């Protein structure tokens, strides 16, 4: 700390102000980045969803979805598991990863999952193994609940000769769990 003597004719209050102006700035400790500082406080979420299965084809059905998104692992990546069913008795159990990108109150979430599919009386997707690529846009309320729209594509990625794929548009409500 560097200070210069002040003349005695300057009042003490002005002397203190002048001394603080000419002091050398204090050194700050170096910034340390750890895994903990890269984490956010996003909770786990339970999502309930309903929508329209096979929106681009003639075998449409109602879609219902239950999904558990775990707390962030790191860099805004969430692992998740889910179960989707349709009014045609198709069932899809899956697990994957999602990435939250927040812009104000809106959350954009691309995700990818793999799982097992049973067609029931619905559309034959060609293989039991199916992959899901999705984009969700949600509004996050002050209490951290989210209301969002998700569009996703299911496909077996040509694991079988028959690979018609399907698209789903669904509305979801996500409830936070700390």
Give the residues covered by each predicted segment.
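Outer-membrane beta-barrel "beta-signal"
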Residues: 164-178
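Repeated loop/turn-to-beta-strand initiation elements of outer-membrane beta-barrel proteins
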Residues: 73-78, 105-108, 143-149
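Transmembrane beta-barrel strands of outer-membrane/channel proteins
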Residues: 48-52, 68, 79-85, 99, ...
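Residues on the lipid-exposed face of transmembrane beta-strands in outer-membrane beta-barrel proteins
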Residues: 64-70, 95-101, 112-114, 135-139, ...
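Solvent-exposed loop/turn segments connecting transmembrane beta-strands
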Residues: 52-62, 83-94, 121-128, 158-166
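Helix-rich interaction surfaces within compact, conserved domain-sized segments
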Residues: 128-141, 146-154
């Amino acid at each position: 700390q560097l200070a210069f003597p002040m003349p005695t004719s300057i009042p003490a209050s002005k002397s203190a102000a002048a001394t603080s102006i000419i002091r050398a700035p204090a050194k700050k400790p170096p910034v340390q980045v750890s895994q903990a500082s890269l984490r956010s406080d996003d909770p786990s979420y339970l999502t309930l969803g309903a929508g329209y299965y096979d929106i681009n084809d003639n075998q449409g059905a109602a879609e219902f979805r239950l999904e558990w998104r775990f707390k962030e692992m790191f860099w805004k990546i969430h692992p998740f598991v889910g179960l989707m069913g349709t009014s045609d008795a198709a069932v899809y159990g899956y697990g994957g990863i999602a990435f939250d990108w927040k812009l104000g109150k809106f959350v954009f979430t691309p995700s990818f999952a793999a799982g097992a599919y049973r067609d029931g009386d619905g559309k034959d997707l060609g293989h039991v193994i199916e992959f899901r690529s999705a984009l969700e846009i949600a509004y996050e309320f002050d209490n951290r609940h989210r209301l969002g729209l998700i569009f996703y594509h299911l496909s077996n990625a040509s694991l079988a000769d028959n690979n018609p794929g399907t698209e789903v548009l669904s509305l979801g409500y996500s409830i936070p769990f700390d």
